[in-house]
Amino acid sequence: MSLGCITPLASAMVGPKLVRPLIHHNPLFHHKPLNRPYLQTKIPLRSRVAQNPINMALITTDEGITRRIGNHHPNLWDDDFIQSLSKAYEAPSYGERAEKLIKDVRDMFNALPLHSSSADDLIQHLSLVDSVERLGIDRHFQNEIKTALDYVYRYWSDAGIGCGRESTHADLNTTALGFRILRLHRYSVSSDVLQQFVLRDGPFLDSNNQPNEDDIKNILNLFRGSLIAFPGENVLDDAKSFTMTYLKQVLPKISNLNLSREIKFNLEYGWHTNVPRLEARTYIDIYGEDSSWASKSINNIFYTKLLELAKLDFNIIQSLQQQELQILSRWWMESDLGKLDFARHRHVEYYLWAATGCIEPKYSAFRIGFAKLSALVTYLDDMYDTYDFDEIKIFTKAIKRWDASIIKGLPEFMKVAFKAFDEAVKDMAQEAKKTQGRDTLDYARKAWEVYIDAYMKEAEWLATGYMPSLEEYLENGKVSAGSRVVTLQPILSLDVPLSDDILKEIDYPSRFDELLCLTLRLRGDTRTFKAEADRGEVVSCITCYMKDHPGSNEEDALNYLNSLIDERLKELNWEYLKTDNVPIISKGNAYNLSKGLQLLYKERDGFTVFSIETKNFIYRMMIGSIPI
């Protein structure tokens, strides 16, 4: 699977502190209109050969050249509709109200030592941190969260913790919740602390008894903690198996609708497909109906303020994202990319991918840049699948030399793609120079050259009918998946300078980057291999595995690959959460892109094939505001 110049925002962001003007004087957010008379109408491609009944067609161009193309469904999101989005929550009054609520919640954190006792202070600290994180407002309280977790960690032990600092016995709920939150904040906590509860609480699995809500919440927090696993942590594998079985058994017996909804959400999305924006929208919906069930450790008045802030913050960010989506849409239309019918038009989906994990208003360049580069990689993907091998070799030469004159004799729409691609890479380099204090264009270009080489190798395999081993395929596929090239420049655009040494810990050849690319390739192949085979692209993880294991079938291959994905995601957890020199904001945004990919490929190819799930995600995240 393979995975922008535009006009400035119409107005400043809302609120003097919550969101600041971010777009002005930024090359990513300006464009020069393209003057190409030959592209004032769609490029004509007349179908003269019957389509394959599944996903393949042959077309004959006006020049008399026959090509094979995938019958990709059209863009689901009309660009005129995107331009009409109202951005209702950009008014300053909303930002001012949000700032007041942020102060109130900050006061809640500061008052924790006054309102908690030695019998419940630990669970109160953890519950408040957990609530602001689930509601998607934790970025406003990073100092307060650190203070709260430092306090909890002071009393952490190998035997776990109880509700309060003077508790004589550890309890499952506080220990499991503490383990999860502390690990996610890079505190050193061992999974062995949970072993006692996996053994002790086995009797909860008695499905003949009416489930106790407190017990269910305990097991739910143990399940959530078990998902933050590192390689070799068998206790977490056991805990996951135990808790999943238990929760599925008791789910039909739960009378509390909101608790039932939370369990269903966690079972369905787990950790690696649960992106921050989706989690926030889901918990806002759940809390909005009744907050009293969620935690006995936080006063309902506090929950009312948390919920109001979460709703307001979600809608304010959504208005910003609508502006960014309009910027992306204008770039798309005015660059003429929308007129290239052979390729997938998925710029909206790619923006969703970036925006569900990267929420900070000041990181517009990250979100828009990622969406632009990803859309262009998809064009290259479809182009390499469509065009004659000799044409592709010329196009590849032009990219590796960054010289448009080389493609003078190629079709006009290849020139369109090259120009848009070249401009996007240069614009992102200008943006990165502001934060890095140096020119990173050559560095980025070299990454693209390596990527193009990997793509050429796959084109050669397709042209010659060569079937590589799984090892050979994955070694090349980690590069051709495109993850590195679409994340590198957006990460460099973040407001954290990265030295060469630090860059090596997050970019190639780091294990972190390798795992991001590998899991993308593996998950993409398990969802797309049948459709690609219908288009004549038979080389995939599945077919390579079957070649290596004569007598095996698709089910065998998928079982092996899904197990491999699970293990590599555990290793990715470790690489993400281990202590190193990489700023967490850089690693975190890259990690969330991985989670976004896992989400959009959760059940099927959420990019190539029409998916009501993806359409609903886009509506809930970026179009439908939350009633306040």
Swiss-Prot record:
GO CC terms of this entry: chloroplast
Binding residue positions for Mg(2+) 2: D381, D385
Coiled-coil regions listed in the entry: none
EC number: 4.2.3.-
Location of the transit peptide in the chain: 1-46
Endpoints of the signal sequence: none
UniProt catalytic activity: (2E)-geranyl diphosphate = alpha-pinene + diphosphate
Residues annotated for Mg(2+) 3 binding in this entry: E532
Family per similarity comment: Belongs to the terpene synthase family. Tpsa subfamily.
Entry remark concerning the domains of this protein: The Asp-Asp-Xaa-Xaa-Asp/Glu (DDXXD/E) motif is important for the catalytic activity, presumably through binding to Mg(2+).
Molecular function via GO: magnesium ion binding; terpene synthase activity
Pfam families: Terpene_synth (PF01397), Terpene_synth_C (PF03936)
Stored SUPFAM superfamilies: Terpenoid cyclases/Protein prenyltransferases, Terpenoid synthases
The keyword Thylakoid is annotated on this UniProt entry: no
Membrane-spanning residues: none
Residue interval(s) of motif DDXXD motif: 381-385
Protein localization: Plastid, Chloroplast
Function recorded in the entry: Monoterpene synthase involved in the biosynthesis of volatile compounds. Mediates the conversion of (2E)-geranyl diphosphate (GPP) into alpha-pinene.
Keywords: Chloroplast, Lyase, Magnesium, Metal-binding, Plastid, Transit peptide
One GO term of the biological process aspect: green leaf volatile biosynthetic process
Pathway assignment: Secondary metabolite biosynthesis; terpenoid biosynthesis
CDD domains cross-referenced by the UniProt entry: Terpene_cyclase_plant_C1
Descriptive protein name: Alpha pinene synthase, chloroplastic
Requisite cofactors: Mg(2+); Mn(2+)
PANTHER family the UniProt entry points to: OS04G0344100 PROTEIN-RELATED
Residues at which Mg(2+) 1 binds: D381, D385
